[in-house]
Amino acid sequence: MARKKIVSGHLKNAISKDEHISVKFVNCIMRDGKKSVAEKVFKDAMELVEEKLGESSLKVFEKAIGNIRPSVEVKSRRVGGSTYQVPTEIKSSRQTALAFRWLLRFSRSRSEKGLSNKLAAELLDAYNERGGAVKKKEDTHKMAEANKAFAHFRW
């Protein structure tokens, strides 16, 4: 019998919430199934962050992700021949997934050498509430605010 609801995946290796988030992020970094490379990039980036700030790198990572996570987004709805951008709230899992995606996209587009350096720089920017990923979040929120009048089209 089919389930009506998707059961969230249980990660065997994740012991705490911190590790769960970092394992998920490593999986987002991974390309072509090369998990060991992704883990090395993440570990190196965290070491660089810890060197520069002198704080726990996982705390910095969590705060940076928290600064990037959007709470609303706009979805296109076609009503009576015209398309409206309708602001909708986002589930927690999607907020985190979008934050990961934006963080990686803007990390990869930076000019530093090596992905671990790029990721560390973008994490520090996100921690200090600046950088491309935070700007993307603000743009998304502005778009939702501008289209607030169409919120009644949500269903």
Curated annotation (Swiss-Prot):
UniProt keyword terms in alphabetical order: Ribonucleoprotein, Ribosomal protein, RNA-binding, rRNA-binding, tRNA-binding
* Keyword Aminoacyl-tRNA synthetase among record annotations: no
The record's PROSITE patterns line, in alphabetical order, gives: RIBOSOMAL_S7 (PS00052)
Q: Name one GO cellular component term.
A: small ribosomal subunit
Q: Which domain of life is it from?
A: Bacteria
Is the ATP-binding keyword given for this protein? no
Q: How does it assemble?
A: Part of the 30S ribosomal subunit. Contacts proteins S9 and S11.
Protein's UniProt name = Small ribosomal subunit protein uS7
